[in-house]
């Protein structure tokens, strides 16, 4: 299990992301007709964040990245393999789930994805994500090449094809 110290990552990511958008898109925000409602909501959230909270969050982000890297190294795990998402993509107006993609992105770890199959019911792709530790890209690439060699066919990737 991931240590409880990392439980607040979704909020930290939201703070950094929304405040960065507020800063970098000031010109676009002066023309509200050109900005989507979801973008405006993100900006509204950013405007509730104080400068000191933003700076503190940036500082803690660097610490989180280093602490996660140390923790992952201590586990002896080379690569984490998990589903790309918890399920199908949510509708635009649905609340965003706190999925692991966001977590690993926040932690700056290398990630790669494999589409594995298309679900016969919802006709949407499903796949796997693979994650390695910070600055361990070559290990991840080597692992991914092994997966590709084992499971790739002319029709794509399929766990059942080469057992």
Model-assigned labels for residue ranges:
Residues 1-12:
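Gly/Ser-rich, acidic/histidine-flanked active-site/gating loops
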Residues 12-69, 115-128:
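Short helix-loop capping/hinge segments that flank enzyme active sites or metal/cofactor-binding pockets
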Residues 13, 84-103:
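Short, surface-exposed loop/helix-turn segments at secondary-structure junctions
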Residues 55, 59, 66, 107-163:
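Structural helix-boundary/capping segments
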Residues 70, 102, 145:
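Surface-exposed charge patches
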Residues 73-77:
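Glycine-rich phosphate-binding loop signature in dinucleotide/nucleotide-binding domains
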């Amino acid at each position: 299990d991931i240590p409880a110290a990392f439980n607040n990552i979704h909020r930290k990511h939201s703070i950094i992301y929304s405040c960065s958008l507020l800063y970098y898109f000031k010109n676009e925000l002066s023309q509200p007709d050109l900005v989507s409602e979801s973008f405006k909501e993100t900006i509204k959230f950013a405007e509730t964040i104080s400068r000191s909270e933003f700076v503190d969050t940036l500082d803690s982000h660097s610490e989180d990245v280093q602490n996660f890297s140390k923790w992952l190294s201590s586990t002896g795990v080379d690569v984490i393999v998990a589903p790309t998402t918890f399920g199908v993509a949510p509708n635009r107006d649905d609340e965003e789930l706190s999925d692991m993609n966001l977590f690993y992105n926040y932690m700056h770890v290398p990630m790669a994805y494999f589409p594995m199959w298309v679900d016969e019911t919802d006709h949407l792709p499903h796949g796997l994500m693979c994650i390695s530790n910070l600055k361990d890209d070559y290990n991840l690439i080597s692992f991914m090449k092994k997966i590709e060699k084992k499971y790739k066919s002319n029709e794509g990737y399929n766990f059942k094809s080469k057992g």
